[in-house]
C-alpha cells in the first residue's frame, strides 16, 4: 500500500508537499443533486481536499456528470426531450446544487457536451486500445432481453431491454433491482442472471445473443491485492470478493447502444458503446486527468509514470464498478494507473427511506441552501456528522433542525464574543498566542487529522475537535486567549466551515486559506469588516419549503 501524504505537526511547515488529485465518481445527469448525494462522497471529498490543502499539500480535483448513462435516455424519452439537452441542463443544476453547499472542484465538466465530447472520446478509445493491446479483452456473446416497446423500424441496438428499462430480482440478495446492479447489496449481474426479469417499458418477448467486450484479469488475486493497496474497508472488500467468487475477475465493458461513446471492433454484431459502470466510469476520471494536465501543463495524474496521489470516492451502489470495473481497467493495461485510495459510503436515508424524486421524498442541495439567512457552514457540519461511512444513516428533519440550532447557538456566542474582544484591542497592542491553549489546539488538531487519515477516513468524526474547542475559552477571556481561540477555530473549522473561517482568517491578517503551519504565527493587522455569525434558527417550515412534496413519514 502506498504511503499517504504526510501531515506535519501543527505550526510546522510541510517540507515535502505531495501532489494529490481527487476524482469522485460522476453523477448521472438525469436529475439534480440532493442531500443524499452531497452528504456522501462529495462533501466527504471536499473536506478531505481542504484538510490536505491546510496541511500544505498541492491538491487538485475534478468531477463530471454522465450524460450517456441509460437512465438519462429513460427520462428523456418520458419527457420527449433530446438526451444531450436534458443531461446538460441537469449538469448545470448539479453544479449549482453542490456549489451551494461550498462543494467545488477545479474542473466540473459535462464530457458528453459540445467540444468536450471529442476529448472524452479520445481518452475513452485510448483506454480501450490499451486494454486490447494488453490482451485484457474478451469478446463473448451474452443473452440480452428484447422487448416489444419498439417497432419494425427501431434499430436493433434500441430494442434491447437493458439499463433503466430492465427490472428484476437480485440473484444474490433477492431484493428488487434493475439495470445491471442491486442497490441493496451492491452486487452486479447480467440481465439473464436476474430472477423475475421484466421490461419497464413493455413486455420481454425474446432473449438474443449479443457480442460485447468484457474485461478479463488473468493473474490470480490481482484485484484483491489492488484493493488492499487502496485501503478498501473490509465490508466493501467482501462485496468485491463475493462478485469474484461468482463471476471471476471479469466485467462487461461495452453494451449495445446508439447514445454513448462508441468503440468499434469486427468482433461485434451490433454497435457497441462503453459501459457506464466499468470502462466509461474509468474514462470519466481519465478525462478529468487530461483536463487537469492541459490546465497545469503537467502530465496527467493518471499517467502510468505519474507520482500524484490519486483519490476516488463513491457510494455502495458503485462498489463493483469501482473495485472490478475501474480497478480492473487500470490493472489491465500499461498506459494508465489505478487509484491510491478509494472511499466508499453507504446510503443516507431521509426519514427512514431512500431519497425519491418521484415521491417528492427529497431535499435538493440547492434548495436548502437558499433558505434565507441559513448558515451553509453549520449545515455542512450537521451533514458531516451523519455521513454514512460505516452503515446507512438517517436524515431526520427534526433532528437536523435541533442539531443545526444547537451548533449555531453555541458557535455564535463564542465566536462573536472573541471577535468583539479582538476588535476592541488598542491598535498598539501586540497579538500573541497562549501557550497552554496551543497545547490543547495541538491535541485537537492531531485528533482531527486522525479522523481524516487516508488509511481510515471518518469525516463523521471531524466536528468533534471543533465542538471541543468551543469549550476551551471562558466567558470573559483575555484578548490573548480570544485571539488564540480564533486562530484555532480557523484551523480546525476550515475543512467543515470554509466560509466563516476564511473570512476570519483574512480578518486576522492572513492571506489565502487557513494553513496549519501558521497556527502560532500572529498578525496585528485587521483586514476588512469584523466577521460575525448572525444566522437565525432553522425551522420546520424552512425544511418543508425545500421539498417537492411533503416528506414521506
Show where each model-derived region lies.
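Basic, alpha-helical terminal appendages of large translation-related enzymes
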Residues: 1-17, 142-145, 156-157, 165-186, ...
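N-terminal catalytic cores of NTP/NDP-binding nucleotidyl/phosphoryl-transfer enzymes
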Residues: 2-90, 109-134, 143, 313-320
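Structured secondary-structure scaffolds
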Residues: 2-43, 50, 62, 181, ...
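A glycine-rich helix N-cap at a beta->alpha junction
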Residues: 85-106
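Short, glycine/charge-rich beta-strand/loop segments that flank catalytic centers
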Residues: 107-121, 140-155, 341-344
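Cys/His-rich short segments
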Residues: 135-213
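Secondary-structure edge/capping motif, primarily at the C-terminal ends of alpha-helices
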Residues: 389-390, 422-426, 448-455, 472-477
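Amphipathic alpha-helices that form helix-helix packing interfaces
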Residues: 411-414, 418-421, 437-448, 459-473, ...
Amino acid at each position: 500500500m502506498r504511503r499517504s501524504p504526510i501531515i506535519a505537526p501543527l505550526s510546522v511547515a510541510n517540507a515535502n508537499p505531495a501532489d494529490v488529485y481527487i476524482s469522485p465518481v460522476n453523477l448521472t445527469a438525469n436529475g439534480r443533486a440532493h442531500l443524499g448525494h452531497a452528504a456522501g462522497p462529495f462533501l466527504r471529498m471536499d473536506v478531505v481536499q481542504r484538510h490536505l490543502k491546510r496541511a500544505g499539500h498541492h491538491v487538485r480535483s475534478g468531477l463530471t456528470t454522465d450524460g450517456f448513462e441509460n437512465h438519462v435516455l429513460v427520462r428523456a424519452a418520458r419527457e420527449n426531450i433530446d438526451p444531450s439537452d436534458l443531461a446538460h441542463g441537469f449538469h448545470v443544476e448539479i453544479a449549482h446544487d453542490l456549489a451551494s453547499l461550498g462543494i467545488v472542484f477545479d474542473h466540473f465538466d459535462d464530457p458528453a457536451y459540445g467540444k468536450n465530447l471529442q476529448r472524452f472520446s479520445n481518452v475513452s478509445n485510448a483506454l480501450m486500445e490499451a486494454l486490447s493491446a494488453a490482451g485484457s479483452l474478451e469478446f463473448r456473446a451474452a443473452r440480452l432481453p428484447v422487448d416489444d416497446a419498439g417497432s419494425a423500424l427501431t434499430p436493433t441496438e434500441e430494442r434491447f431491454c437493458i439499463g433503466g428499462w430492465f427490472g428484476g430480482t437480485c440473484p444474490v440478495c433477492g431484493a428488487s433491482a434493475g439495470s445491471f446492479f442491486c442497490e441493496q447489496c451492491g452486487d452486479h449481474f447480467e440481465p439473464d442472471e436476474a430472477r423475475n426479469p421484466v421490461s419497464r417499458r413493455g413486455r420481454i418477448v425474446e432473449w438474443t445473443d449479443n457480442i460485447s467486450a468484457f474485461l478479463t484479469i488473468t493473474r490470480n488475486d490481482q484485484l484483491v491485492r489492488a484493493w488492499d493497496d487502496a485501503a478498501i474497508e473490509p465490508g466493501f472488500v467482501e462485496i468485491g470478493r463475493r462478485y469474484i467468487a461468482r463471476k471471476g475477475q471479469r466485467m462487461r465493458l461495452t453494451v449495445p447502444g446508439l447514445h454513448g461513446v462508441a468503440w468499434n471492433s469486427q468482433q461485434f454484431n451490433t454497435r457497441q458503446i462503453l459501459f457506464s459502470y466499468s470502462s466509461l466510469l474509468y474514462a470519466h476520471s481519465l478525462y478529468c486527468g487530461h483536463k487537469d494536465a492541459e490546465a497545469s501543463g503537467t502530465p496527467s495524474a493518471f499517467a502510468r509514470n505519474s507520482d500524484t496521489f490519486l483519490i476516488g470516492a463513491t457510494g455502495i451502489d458503485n462498489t463493483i464498478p469501482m473495485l472490478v470495473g475501474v480497478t480492473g481497467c487500470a490493472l489491465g493495461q500499461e498506459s494508465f494507473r489505478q487509484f491510491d485510495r478509494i472511499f466508499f459510503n453507504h446510503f443516507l436515508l431521509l426519514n427512514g427511506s431512500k431519497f425519491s424524486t418521484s415521491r417528492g421524498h427529497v431535499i435538493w442541495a440547492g434548495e436548502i441552501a437558499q433558505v434565507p439567512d441559513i448558515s451553509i457552514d453549520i449545515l455542512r457540519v450537521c451533514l458531516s456528522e451523519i455521513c454514512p461511512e460505516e452503515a446507512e444513516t438517517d436524515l431526520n428533519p427534526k433532528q437536523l433542525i435541533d442539531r443545526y440550532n444547537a451548533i449555531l447557538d453555541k458557535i455564535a456566542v463564542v465566536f462573536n464574543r472573541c471577535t468583539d474582544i479582538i476588535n476592541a484591542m488598542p491598535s498598539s497592542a501586540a497579538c500573541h498566542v497562549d501557550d497552554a491553549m496551543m497545547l490543547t489546539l495541538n491535541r485537537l488538531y492531531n485528533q482531527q487529522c486522525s479522523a481524516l487519515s487516508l488509511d481510515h477516513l471518518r469525516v463523521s468524526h471531524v466536528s468533534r475537535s471543533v465542538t471541543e474547542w468551543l469549550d476551551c475559552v471562558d466567558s470573559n477571556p483575555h484578548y490573548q486567549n480570544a485571539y488564540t481561540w480564533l486562530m484555532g477555530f480557523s484551523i480546525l473549522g476550515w475543512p467543515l466551515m470554509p466560509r466563516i473561517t476564511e473570512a476570519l482568517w483574512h480578518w486576522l491578517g492572513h492571506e489565502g486559506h487557513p494553513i496549519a503551519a501558521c497556527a502560532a504565527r500572529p498578525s496585528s493587522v485587521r483586514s476588512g469588516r469584523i466577521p460575525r455569525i448572525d444566522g437565525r434558527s432553522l425551522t420546520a417550515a424552512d425544511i418543508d419549503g425545500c421539498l417537492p412534496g411533503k416528506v414521506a413519514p
